[in-house]
């Protein structure tokens, strides 16, 4: 158990903890309504749900920016300093308590800069935006969503101005997802990917498609669900604390210390989509379950929260790509899929089907090689929308042009294009780079894991993935917000974050897939 969860006394520190706990309860209610909106709520309930979420957002903001909260922080800081100077704390307690206070004070300042009216309006706009996005996506009609998107952009720009953090608009909005990230650093990290990924995609485009990928096949929804349930069981699912549902866009969410939810979706004609989405979202959930001290009393302390969304993505990508898409995994699972109706006659069939190299339109269904290009396009476009004057009405055309240039494909309609993701409908500008940063982090952490306990594929081959989870539980999950993403990577791997491990991994896997696609020489 982490030392920081022990209160310094029953006085200021305990009162602060009780206040944070009540704030977290409100946040949990808000998350529960979000879960319901995405999984079960009837479409006509959107307006009322918007009012509910707006009220909760204003109440949360009031608590997170109140003079009472500020006073509790001042008292807790004084109590901490007194105990530190008196030598009453262990060195680790000093470091961890100081970090908790630093993060709470930082979050308080950010909340105090925001107008409560703007907070409420944003909550309403996000709920309405999601409803409009659903309608627009179903009808492949961007014009239905455009006014809601413009409203969200205007509100987010106003939010960035109010925060006045000496950052650009996009940087300011990205901070909740990637603390301390700057555009300059993002451009530095993404530059080698912009240069190398298009060449790798073009190289792979000429390959012959594997038999399993070329065959048109599907599995019944209940069959897909059964395979997903079997996967989660093998990967240690505890039915008493987890719940799985369906939604238009897969996601994972934590509603409480013992309440972890995830969703998946069934895509007609893409029978592996549901399985891989489940693996991905379960990786998110495993990370949440492994964060420090998930108990009712301490759930809300900063050090018990996720480091960043890029670290979150690194964990989901590890389980999806390093485990579920691995050759040893296919060796174990292809008979189960074949028995369920898949046209697999050997492990290679399933492995190639799990790893198609075929640049397409959809980010969620993208292969590992072209995925980064999807993120580069979205990152550039949201920066253009927020900072460079790209008109909302021009977004579909600009989207289609960039897809043609980078991926060699063009959407037939808006649903295949700029309406495919939910993020902008919820005002989540600054989120998309976390996906690609997550790939970089996952690759570098996987190298560190390999050096420590052997390659992940070796453990998968032995049929025991628990050592992989144990290593992550020991070295990654417990860090919480004690560090930012880049500090975590350097602490665990011993090297600054770079693209080297990720590009090396892609090129190695590309070579193996290419060899597997060649006809046998007789």
Language-model features and meaning:
Residues 462, 473-517:
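C-terminal amphipathic alpha-helical interaction region
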Residues 2-179, 507-519:
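A well-structured
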Residues 122-273:
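Contiguous, non-catalytic segments that form substrate-binding/exosite surfaces or channel walls
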Residues 313-314, 375, 379, 383, ...:
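Feature representing long, continuous alpha-helical segments
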Residues 273-292, 313-317:
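Active-site recognition of the HExxH zinc-binding catalytic motif
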Residues 325-426:
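Long, amphipathic alpha-helical stalk/connector segments used for oligomerization, subunit docking
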Residues 440, 444-453, 457-484:
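An amphipathic alpha-helical core segment
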Residues 370, 427-447, 499:
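C-terminal substrate/ligand-recognition segments
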């Amino acid at each position: 158990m982490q030392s920081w969860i022990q209160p310094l006394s029953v006085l200021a520190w305990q009162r602060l903890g009780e206040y944070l706990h009540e704030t977290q309860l409100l946040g949990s209610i808000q998350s529960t309504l979000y879960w319901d909106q995405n999984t079960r709520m009837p479409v006509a309930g959107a307006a009322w749900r918007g009012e509910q979420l707006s009220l909760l957002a204003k109440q949360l903001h009031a608590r997170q920016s109140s003079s009472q909260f500020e006073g509790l922080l001042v008292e807790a800081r004084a109590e901490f300093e007194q105990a530190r100077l008196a030598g009453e704390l262990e060195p680790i307690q000093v470091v961890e308590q100081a970090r908790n206070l630093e993060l709470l004070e930082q979050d308080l300042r950010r909340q105090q800069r925001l107008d409560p009216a703007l907070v409420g309006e944003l909550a309403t706009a996000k709920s309405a935006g999601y409803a409009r996005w659903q309608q627009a996506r179903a009808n492949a009609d961007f014009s239905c969503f455009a006014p809601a998107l413009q409203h969200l952009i205007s509100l987010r720009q106003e939010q960035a101005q109010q925060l006045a953090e000496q950052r650009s608009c996009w940087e300011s909005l990205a901070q909740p997802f990637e603390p301390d990230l700057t555009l300059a650093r993002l451009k530095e990290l993404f530059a080698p990917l912009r240069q190398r990924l298009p060449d790798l995609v073009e190289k792979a485009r000429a390959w012959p498609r594997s038999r399993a990928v070329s065959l048109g096949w599907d599995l019944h929804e209940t069959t897909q669900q059964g395979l997903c349930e079997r996967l989660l069981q093998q990967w240690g699912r505890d039915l008493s604390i987890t719940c799985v549902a369906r939604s238009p866009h897969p996601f994972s969410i934590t509603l409480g210390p013992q309440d972890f939810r995830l969703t998946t979706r069934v895509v007609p004609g893409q029978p592996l989509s549901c399985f891989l989405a489940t693996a991905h979202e379960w990786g998110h959930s495993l990370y949440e379950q492994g964060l420090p001290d998930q108990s009712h009393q301490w759930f809300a302390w900063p050090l018990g929260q996720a480091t960043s969304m890029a670290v979150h993505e690194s964990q989901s990508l590890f389980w999806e790509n390093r485990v579920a898409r691995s050759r040893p995994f296919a060796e174990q699972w292809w008979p189960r899929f074949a028995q369920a109706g898949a046209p697999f006659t050997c492990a290679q069939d399933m492995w190639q089907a799990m790893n198609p190299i075929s640049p397409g339109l959809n980010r969620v269904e993208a292969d590992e090689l072209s995925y980064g290009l999807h993120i580069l396009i979205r990152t550039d476009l949201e920066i253009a929308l927020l900072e460079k004057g790209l008109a909302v009405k021009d977004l579909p055309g600009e989207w289609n042009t960039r897809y043609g240039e980078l991926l060699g494909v063009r959407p037939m309609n808006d649903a295949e294009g700029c309406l495919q993701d939910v993020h902008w409908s919820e005002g989540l500008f600054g989120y998309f780079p976390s996906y690609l940063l997550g790939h970089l982090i996952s690759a570098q952490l996987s190298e560190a894991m390999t050096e420590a306990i052997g390659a992940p594929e070796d453990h998968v081959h032995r049929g025991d993935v628990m050592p992989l989870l144990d290593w992550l539980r020991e070295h990654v999950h417990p860090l919480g917000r004690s560090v930012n993403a880049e500090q975590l990577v350097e602490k665990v791997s011993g090297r600054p974050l770079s693209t080297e491990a990720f590009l090396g991994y892609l090129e190695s896997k590309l070579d193996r897939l290419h060899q597997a696609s060649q006809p046998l020489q007789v």
